[in-house]
């Protein structure tokens, strides 16, 4: 049921806004469900799992790994000391060969322990920590009495080295991930559609907040919208490429200062039949991707963002952000997201704009080049000179024929001479009634 506003007009409920496929910060809004053997697959690639996990979870995992290893080997050392009988000896018993406790007699010889000064589980745990971390206080140590204790010390040292190397490698890989470099790559909040070089174009702006370059930087864009095939198959996330200059190399950019990426809306564009009104009612999302290698690590990074139909401003352009100073160029990032409206931007689609240009305003023929124009002038002047020479020669012939001035034939000859046609002059000479005297004179000559 439609609601009513305060002024009495009916209020039409707006259509539910579609969920983003890619968020503005570049994260993909996708949740994986019902994965079979997910834990086994993730544990099979434990290194990538640790690198992809959050810092707090990774620190918890390694802290638990160290604690478990210390407890395990501490329990192992305690068991060795327990079964060897080291825990039953009194701490005050003198060592073998020591002075007597009293009476001047020989002191009883105490059995040599496997681990010196380990009288309980706490002592065994401390010895385990000292062994794995190579602290080496020197108070507790293993004797040659128990080979099993020696083997346990060797195994714990190897396990400690493995855990340390794995932890250091994972932390370094996580810190050097190019994903964090994408945090300093910036996309404009809005995309715009306006006329550039006589054609409607979709434009958005990208920038690099660091002075270090992105090597081999290039951009891509895809339009994502629901699509129904001719067979009735529904595709909720159909992807269409938006050409940003792949064929002529405009997709490769030198990202030192902010650059406006341009998609020309032509016949191959999914936006070709979309005008301003259709844009306001369409349900689509444009995903923009910037890829390149980090200059410091040579690792590939990717920054992503997206624009919904409501985030595309029709008839707007971006404000300039690069200004030339005395000795350098200044980039004002306070203007990075700002746009201004362009008056006179057509509200029709690119198809309608192209058809109107063809039917109403045909393109004028291309002007001749300067070289052709000069040749044409030279040819015209040469033809005029030839016409003047032919006219002079015809006048001399007419004077030799002895025509009477003012006669009709002479007037016709003069007109033909002025016209400059040699063939007409010959036909006129053949039709003139020449007298016998003149003819004989010509023949005699």
Curated annotation (Swiss-Prot):
Intramembrane region residues: 121-132, 133-139
Tissue-level expression: Heart, skeletal muscle, and several different brain regions including the hippocampus.
Topological domain ranges for the Cytoplasmic compartment: 1-55, 171-445
Motif Selectivity filter per UniProt: ranges: 134-139
Transmembrane intervals: 56-80, 149-170
Residue runs in coiled coils: none
InterPro entries: Ig_E-set, IRK_C, K_chnl_inward-rec_Kir, K_chnl_inward-rec_Kir2.3, K_chnl_inward-rec_Kir_cyto, Kir_TM
Any single biological process term in GO: potassium ion transport
GO CC entries: basolateral plasma membrane; cytoplasmic vesicle membrane; plasma membrane; postsynaptic membrane; voltage-gated potassium channel complex
Compartments, as annotated in UniProt: Cell membrane; Postsynaptic cell membrane; Cytoplasmic vesicle membrane
Keywords of this entry: Cell membrane, Cytoplasmic vesicle, Ion channel, Ion transport, Membrane, Postsynaptic cell membrane, Potassium, Potassium transport, Synapse, Transmembrane, Transmembrane helix, Transport, Voltage-gated channel
SUPFAM superfamilies: E set domains, Voltage-gated potassium channels
Subunit architecture: Homomultimeric and heteromultimeric association with KCNJ2 and KCNJ12. Interacts with DLG2 and DLG4. Associates, via its PDZ-recognition domain, with a complex containing LIN7A, LIN7B, LIN7C, DLG1, CASK and APBA1. Interacts with TAX1BP3. TAX1BP3 competes with LIN7 family members for KCNJ4 binding.
Stated name of the protein: Inward rectifier potassium channel 4
Annotated source species: Homo sapiens (Human)
Underlying gene: KCNJ4
């Amino acid at each position: 049921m439609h609601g009513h506003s305060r002024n009495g007009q009916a209020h039409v409920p707006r259509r539910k806004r579609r969920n983003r496929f890619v968020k503005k910060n570049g994260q993909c809004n996708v949740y994986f469900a019902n994965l079979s053997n997910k834990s086994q697959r993730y544990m099979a690639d434990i290194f990538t799992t640790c690198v992809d996990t959050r810092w707090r979870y990774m620190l918890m995992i390694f802290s638990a790994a160290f604690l478990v290893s210390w407890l395990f080997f501490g329990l192992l050392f305690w068991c060795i000391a327990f079964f060897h009988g080291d825990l039953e000896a009194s701490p005050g018993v003198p060592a073998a060969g020591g002075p007597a406790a009293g009476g001047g007699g020989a002191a009883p010889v105490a059995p040599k322990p496997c681990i010196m000064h380990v009288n309980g589980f706490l002592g065994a745990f401390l010895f385990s920590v000292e062994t794995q971390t190579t602290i080496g206080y020197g108070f507790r140590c293993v004797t040659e009495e128990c080979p099993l204790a020696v083997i346990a010390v060797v195994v714990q040292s190897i396990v400690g080295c493995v855990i340390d190397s794995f932890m250091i490698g994972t932390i370094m890989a996580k810190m050097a991930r190019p994903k964090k470099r994408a945090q300093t790559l910036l996309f404009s909040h809005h995309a715009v559609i306006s006329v550039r070089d006589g054609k409607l174009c979709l434009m958005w702006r990208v920038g690099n907040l660091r002075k270090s370059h992105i090597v081999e930087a290039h951009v891509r864009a895809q339009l994502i919208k629901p699509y129904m095939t001719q067979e009735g198959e529904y595709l909720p996330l159909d992807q269409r490429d938006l050409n940003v200059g792949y064929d002529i190399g405009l997709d490769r950019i030198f990202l030192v200062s902010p650059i406006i990426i341009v998609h020309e809306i032509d016949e191959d564009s999914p936006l070709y039949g979309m005008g301003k009104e259709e844009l306001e009612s369409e349900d689509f999302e444009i995903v923009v991707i910037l890829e390149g290698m980090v200059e410091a690590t040579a690792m590939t990074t990717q920054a992503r963002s997206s624009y919904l139909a409501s985030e595309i401003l029709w008839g707007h352009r971006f404000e300039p952000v690069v200004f030339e100073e005395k000795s350098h160029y200044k980039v004002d990032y306070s203007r990075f997201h700002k746009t201004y409206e362009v008056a006179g931007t057509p509200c029709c689609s690119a198809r309608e704009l192209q058809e109107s240009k063809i039917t109403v305003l045909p393109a004028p023929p291309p002007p001749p080049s300067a070289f052709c124009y000069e040749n044409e002038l030279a040819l015209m002047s040469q033809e005029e000179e030839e016409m003047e020479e032919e006219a002079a020669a015809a006048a001399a012939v007419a004077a030799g024929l002895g025509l009477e001035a003012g006669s009709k034939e002479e007037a016709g000859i003069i007109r033909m001479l002025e016209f400059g046609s040699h063939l007409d002059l010959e036909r006129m000479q053949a039709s003139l009634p020449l007298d016998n005297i003149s003819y004989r004179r010509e023949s005699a000559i």
